[in-house]
């Protein structure tokens, strides 16, 4: 489209003035923005990384993870921390619930000696700590556990039974406005864990809602709904849970995907089980009866034995992970092989 020469000169002068006043990159043409390829951190779950579309959670953004009690919210965030620390990133955990178990975190692969941890007294203190860490530019990942535990100072100083309508929502709204630009400039990922509540008197539609008002919903680039959908048993003993995560909002890729995976108690996400399932579905692993083969070589009989084989052969597991990511994340043609990534209706992608 041809633009009048006088308009072009006026536009160039305006852009130059804006950049002088606010800095280079403060305004640009959208197609020139090389930062559109968003840097991501793996969630620790291959199927969830694929469901997110970008290969993980986006840096410089706000992410909300919510669900019922004991659904795996904290476990998922600790897996994110473990993955980030392996890449040399600095992480912080704002434990507003005062319930973080360092032994459990260590079992999931978190380097607790290098994990920054704070147990704030008030919601304002927690959010201010987040802002200071972000503006330092030195912290890459911040977890807040949880929004429901971010109690305003006025509520703590008041008496039980006092009315504080909308206080937490106003606090969160103000914090979101302040944090968003700082997170982008520092390229820091901020993850809020949230709980669900039931709306009273809802006859139709979903009665569930999250705490802390609507601001977090709007400012989040990614929102994940995590649910426990079953149990994992060895004989009669329950050793883990079947977990489903729905991407209910996604600003960096297509939303409404679902990912199913197992969480083993005390160990975290069963990443080797995901590799086996996705490998079979994508014809990277051959299955004949109960035997599994890779590149023509048998690697085990039964899924549990194959998982143990991959556990003790990390190079093979890494090779399989790399091939699956290249196939499912960078392949523009969608195939039936995206089996563990499901759409909002619960049907498999085709």
From Swiss-Prot:
Keyword terms, alphabetized: ATP-binding, Cytoplasm, DNA damage, DNA recombination, DNA repair, DNA-binding, Nucleotide-binding, SOS response
The source's superkingdom equals Bacteria
Name the Gene Ontology biological process terms: DNA recombination; DNA repair; SOS response
**A molecular function (GO) term:** damaged DNA binding
Binding residues annotated for ATP, in chain numbering: 67-74
Q: Which residue ranges traverse the bilayer?
A: none
Q: Where in the cell is it found?
A: Cytoplasm
GO CC aspect terms: cytosol
Spell out the InterPro entries in the cross-references.
Answer: AAA+_ATPase, DNA_recomb/repair_RecA, DNA_recomb/repair_RecA_CS, P-loop_NTPase, RecA-like_C, RecA-like_N, RecA_ATP-bd, RecA_C_sf
Functionally, this protein is described as follows:
Can catalyze the hydrolysis of ATP in the presence of single-stranded DNA, the ATP-dependent uptake of single-stranded DNA by duplex DNA, and the ATP-dependent hybridization of homologous single-stranded DNAs. It interacts with LexA causing its activation and leading to its autocatalytic cleavage.
Name the PANTHER family on file: MITOCHONDRIAL DNA REPAIR PROTEIN RECA HOMOLOG-RELATED, RECA
The entry assigns this protein to a family as follows: Belongs to the RecA family.
What HAMAP family does the annotation carry?
Answer: RecA
Protein name in UniProt: Protein RecA
Q: Tell me the organism's taxonomic lineage.
A: Bacteria, Pseudomonadati, Pseudomonadota, Gammaproteobacteria, Candidatus Palibaumannia
What is this protein's gene name?
recA
